[in-house]
């Protein structure tokens, strides 16, 4: 593979004399077509490559044409394209399982597709470079355009984890053969087609069974089911009161008894303790402990912290991170890795120093590089990092949301290479009136990485807990009781899901049921989990309630009703997580795509032939009546896309 020269050398490098035939000799500039995923990224590529001449839908110069997609330009055709009878929804026509898949150009992006198609067929273009996002969906976006355009020219793959100019230049010098990503493309195709088959067949099946539009999704429905199960557990929870006796010791500190279910038992102990007036030290145990630095961020971990500390939704965090990536301030955001590769070790100390300086961290930062290096745990992209470009950027000019997300990512880098947080934990066991009382104290020995965390995120972390210092006493010694009181408490129900905890539940779904040695994928991927939550909210299955930082995600009545009528196999997180694991195996070339698709088709066929409407479910699925139709007097009901008269003839 020839080396990509600097832009100033491009004309000489890419101009070659071509003999069209024996009678006609001409000079043609041979160009390479670069296809990015979006215009802003294409602009960054064009700047590095020297393609500075703006055209309609692309840039040109120095041997390159740089154009872009606008999301998915090509999409799966709807059922009626396969057969006109599918316009009408009928259980008799199910399952719909295409043998030969058909695709259409999205109506809203036909112009840009046309531009790409013309560029791919230009006689001076000898090859194409796939420069869409380096991941499963980016691969799919390009390949569908390439195939739909009927392009047969060779193409190579640009694979980047950073949008810095040096990284872009190096990436174009080290283009990958397209065949290295065939398995990734196969996994993307399987994911897209499986989602289509589940969505089309299940949505039609249950809509027909219950007489109203019901949206069902391979990933969406299990996530909704998790929230419904959680709310059912909260509703079924029975609060139980309990009672404890709390002693205030004259030498300092407090001590608590065990819990009593009966108030009378606790009151009896309280009376005895007041009468006895002193405790005997039975055991004093001191242990030194440490808390290791946190791992670097992957996307899901970043989204969880941004929700917990900043109140951002998962989608907001992804949008901010994507913008920072395109501004060359962070590395590729849609990563599922929390480590770096061995070849990054040498440059990491400089990045840590630059990052600390950018955020005015004046204290010396210990740098333990090996804590974050583990190439065996890096998949397509390494963990999220700030870039060196950030050191010279005007951070104050960034929108507040982007600035806060950048601060989180930078703080995590500084913490991850830091020293352990060390503390001493003391447990004091005393006896009063024949009953054991316990006290716990904690004293910080060395702040370690938490000092940097407080410096970077102090206002976001909230008020720190004061250390609890227990009196220095000897075993079998006695201490006077300065006060005793009865305290009443109650057991706590499960907590409502927040975006933070729901992301965690999606990430860890089916962990207990996975066989030993099998890599767990959870529900969805880091790149799709935010979109899944947003889709559930937009379709009216989930709603956000509460203040910004404490918003919870609650299933609506519509969401609860949908899960009530769903068969277990459709709402099962375990099955969906198993599919994600199999998609990963396809991506790695460990599983045949045809085998996976056959499994999906069998499941759908079985579902269609065995599922019947549940008795009484129509009552649950009934739409909300909001008024009377002025035309015919029938009920006007609220549905997903607006208000409709129940009378189909109206």
Mark where each language-model region is.
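OB-fold/S1-family RNA-binding modules
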Residues: 29, 79, 124-129, 250-272, ...
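Intrinsically disordered, low-complexity regulatory segments
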Residues: 10, 14, 18-192, 196, ...
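Structured, non-catalytic alpha/beta "coupling" segments that mediate domain-domain communication
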Residues: 55-86, 221-265, 414-468, 640-648
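Metal- or metallocofactor-binding catalytic centers and their adjacent structured scaffolds
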Residues: 179, 263-297, 303
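Basic, low-complexity terminal or inter-domain segments flanking catalytic cores
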Residues: 26-33, 109, 120, 148, ...
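C-terminal or mid-to-C-terminal helical accessory/interaction module adjacent to the motor/catalytic core
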Residues: 101, 123, 165-249, 286-290
């Amino acid at each position: 593979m020839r080396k990509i020269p600097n832009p100033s050398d491009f004309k000489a490098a890419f101009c070659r004399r071509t003999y069209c035939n024996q009678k006609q000799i001409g000079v043609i500039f041979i160009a390479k077509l670069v296809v990015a995923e979006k215009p802003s990224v294409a602009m960054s590529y064009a700047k590095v490559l020297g393609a500075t001449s703006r055209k309609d839908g692309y840039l040109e110069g120095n041997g390159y044409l740089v154009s872009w997609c606008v999301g998915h330009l090509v999409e799966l055709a709807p059922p009626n394209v396969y057969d006109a009878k599918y316009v009408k929804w009928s259980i008799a026509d199910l399952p719909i399982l295409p043998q030969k898949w058909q695709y259409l150009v999205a109506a809203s992006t036909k112009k840009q597709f046309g531009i790409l198609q013309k560029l791919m067929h230009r006689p001076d273009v000898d090859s194409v470079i796939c420069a869409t996002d380096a991941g499963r969906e980016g691969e799919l976006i390009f390949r569908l355009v390439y195939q739909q355009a009927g392009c047969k020219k060779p193409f190579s793959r640009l694979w980047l984890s950073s949008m810095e100019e040096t990284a872009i230049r190096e990436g174009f010098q080290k283009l990958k053969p397209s065949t290295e990503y065939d398995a990734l493309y196969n996994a993307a195709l399987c994911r897209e087609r499986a989602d289509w088959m589940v969505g089309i067949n299940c949505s039609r099946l249950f809509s027909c069974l219950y007489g109203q539009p019901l949206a069902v999704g391979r990933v969406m429905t299990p996530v909704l089911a998790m929230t419904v199960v959680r709310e059912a557990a909260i509703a079924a929870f029975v609060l139980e009161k309990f009672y404890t006796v709390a002693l205030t010791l004259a030498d300092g500190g407090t001590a608590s008894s065990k819990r009593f279910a009966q108030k009378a038992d606790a009151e009896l102990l309280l009376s005895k303790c007041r009468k006895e007036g002193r405790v005997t030290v039975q055991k004093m145990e001191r242990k030194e402990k440490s808390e290791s630095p946190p791992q670097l961020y992957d996307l899901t971990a970043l989204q969880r912290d941004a929700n917990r500390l900043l109140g951002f939704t998962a989608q907001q965090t992804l949008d901010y991170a994507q913008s920072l990536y395109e501004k060359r301030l962070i590395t590729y955001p849609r990563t599922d890795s929390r480590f770096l590769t061995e070849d990054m070790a040498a440059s990491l100390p400089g990045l840590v120093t630059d990052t600390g300086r950018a955020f005015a961290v004046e204290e010396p930062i210990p740098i333990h590089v090996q804590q974050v290096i583990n190439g065996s745990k890096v998949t397509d992209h390494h963990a999220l990092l700030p870039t060196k470009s950030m050191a010279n950027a005007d951070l104050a000019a960034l929108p507040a949301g982007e600035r806060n997300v950048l601060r989180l990512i930078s703080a995590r880098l500084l913490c991850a290479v830091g020293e352990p947080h060390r503390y001493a934990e003391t447990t004091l066991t005393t006896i009063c009136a024949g009953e054991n009382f316990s006290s716990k104290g904690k004293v910080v020995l060395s702040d370690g990485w938490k000092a940097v965390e407080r410096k970077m995120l102090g206002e976001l972390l909230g008020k720190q807990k004061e250390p609890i210092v227990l009196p220095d006493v000897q075993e079998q010694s006695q201490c006077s009781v300065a006060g005793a009181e009865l305290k009443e408490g109650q057991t706590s129900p499960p907590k409502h899901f927040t975006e933070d905890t729901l992301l965690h539940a999606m990430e860890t779904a089916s962990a207990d049921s996975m066989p030993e040695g099998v890599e767990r994928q959870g529900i969805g991927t880091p790149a799709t989990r935010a979109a899944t939550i947003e889709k559930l909210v937009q379709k009216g299955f989930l709603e956000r309630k509460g203040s910004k930082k404490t918003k919870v995600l609650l299933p609506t009545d519509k969401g609860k009703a949908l899960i009530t009528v769903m068969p277990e196999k459709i709402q099962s997180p375990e099955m969906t997580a198993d599919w994600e694991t199999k998609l990963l195996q396809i991506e790695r070339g460990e599983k045949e795509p045809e085998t996976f698709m056959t499994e999906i088709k069998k499941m759908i066929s079985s579902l269609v032939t065995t599922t019947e409407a549940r008795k009484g479910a129509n009552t649950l699925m009934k739409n909300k009546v909001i008024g009377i139709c002025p035309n015919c007097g029938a009920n006007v009901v609220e549905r997903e896309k607006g208000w409709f008269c129940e009378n189909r003839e109206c």
